[in-house]
Amino acid sequence: MKYLALAALVFIAPNLKAQTVENTSYITKTGEKVLRLESVLPIGLQEAWQLFTTDEQLQKWIAPFAHIELRTGGYIITNYDKTKSLADSSSIRLQIINYIEQQLLTLKVKLNNNFSKTVQNEDGNLQEVIQFIQVSSTSTKIISSMIGWGDSEEWSKTYDFFVRGNIYTYEELLKLYK
């Protein structure tokens, strides 16, 4: 009986963790905020990478309209509104600063008109760094860290918006495996 319980922990526990987005945000020693979210997907590293780097897979979870040009200096463009196109001004365009295949994807976050002009003018360092860590041949940890936040009341509101929005988005990703 003891071995059955141990087997259940070994085989079931990793899949239970895959059902949650864990907020592990923190403040660095220099006082900078890091919005950090972690989740474990019950899929291999190559499949997890494709969820972030192919149009078809992005459209399953990030937005109904999504396109990626995977290269340094490339971009991801999305639109959450099914009545609009990627050419519409409401689309969100994230520049790909760099990537290391199946390990790292760094995106430049450019705030749109949903945010105050002040934070839009100060968003030069705002980035999302996405890490892909192989836990096993059938399990991949995703760590999303947003860095480059400003320090004001308006920036606090922007940070809070992304806490809610990013948790929601990564929960949408996890729903593919529930």
Language-model segment annotations:
Residues 1-24:
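Bacterial Sec-dependent N-terminal signal peptides
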Residues 18-20, 147-178:
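A conserved amphipathic terminal alpha-helix motif
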Residues 42-46, 97-105, 131-141, 175-178:
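A short, structured loop/turn motif at beta-sheet edges
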Residues 37-39, 91-98, 125-134:
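Hydrophobic/aromatic beta-strand elements that line small-molecule binding cavities or substrate pockets
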Residues 116-163:
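Beta-strand/loop substructures that line and gate deep hydrophobic ligand-binding cavities in soluble
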Residues 48-49, 58, 76, 96, ...:
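Hydrophobic pocket/interface hotspot
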Residues 56-91, 99:
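Short beta-edge strand/loop motif at the mouth of beta-sheet-based domains
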Residues 16-65, 69:
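Hydrophobic ligand-binding cavity/cleft-lining segments
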